[in-house]
């Protein structure tokens, strides 16, 4: 069982230095427009994913006129107390630690604090293209399966290399099909793992959705 007991924000978005305590299992956040309700939720997202829900650029989350941010959360995970701290240094370097133990790779943290975001643009999962649905599914499976995330990282990196190679074919006229074959072969292992895990999840999940829909 996971529970967030408190969170402290330093120079995060519109917060100069502010702390919030969450004493109940269910918490409602209310306030006038512009006071920072969504920013508070985004700070919680930061503790779960080490990034903002809204932007990939960490600098966009720094309070205007300042440098660096610090987000600290006090958690209870399976009856044990944990302190999670995310720091963006003045140099732009980002650090994340749980109980003062820093991660070598941020991907090691994903799934430790499961997080579900419900937002108006979720309608895109139904009305939008398949890319939005794949992204949603990937985010969910990465929290459930660390190995899935590692395969996904490798797969995306190879796809980038493959696309760059195809672009060079067009720009230079030099067609290195041997290298293209190597990249295609490297895609097989992570691609099969990703496909199988997506299929496995959907076989389990779709009957539940159909039952709720009916």
Regions found by a protein language model. Give the residues of each.
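Generic alpha-helix structural propensity
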Residues: 24, 35, 39, 56, ...
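Pre-Walker A-like glycine/lysine-rich segment at the N-terminus of P-loop NTPase domains
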Residues: 1-46
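An accessory alpha-helical subdomain
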Residues: 121-212
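Short amphipathic alpha-helical segments enriched in hydrophobics
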Residues: 44, 48-52, 166
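Nucleotide-state sensing region of NTPase/ATPase domains
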Residues: 49-126, 130-132, 141-144, 148, ...
């Amino acid at each position: 069982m996971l529970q967030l007991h408190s969170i402290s924000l330093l120079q995060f978005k519109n917060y100069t230095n502010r702390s919030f305590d969450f004493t109940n299992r269910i918490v409602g956040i209310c306030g006038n427009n512009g006071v920072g309700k969504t920013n508070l939720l985004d700070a919680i997202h930061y503790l779960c994913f080490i990034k903002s829900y809204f932007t990939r650029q960490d600098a966009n989350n720094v309070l205007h006129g300042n440098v660096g941010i610090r987000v600290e959360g006090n958690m209870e995970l399976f009856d044990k107390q944990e302190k999670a701290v995310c720091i963006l240094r003045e140099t732009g370097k980002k650090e994340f630690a749980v109980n003062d133990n820093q991660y070598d790779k941020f991907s090691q943290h994903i799934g430790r604090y499961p997080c579900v975001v419900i937002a108006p643009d979720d309608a895109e999962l139904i009305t939008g293209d398949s890319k939005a649905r794949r992204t949603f599914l990937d985010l969910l499976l990465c929290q459930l399966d660390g190995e899935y995330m590692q395969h996904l990282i490798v797969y995306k990196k190879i796809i980038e290399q493959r696309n760059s190679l195809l672009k060079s074919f067009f720009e230079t006229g030099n067609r290195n099909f041997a290298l293209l074959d190597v990249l295609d072969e490297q895609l097989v292992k992570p691609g099969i793992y990703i496909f199988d895990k997506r299929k496995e999840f959907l076989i389990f999940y779709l009957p539940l959705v159909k039952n709720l829909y009916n």
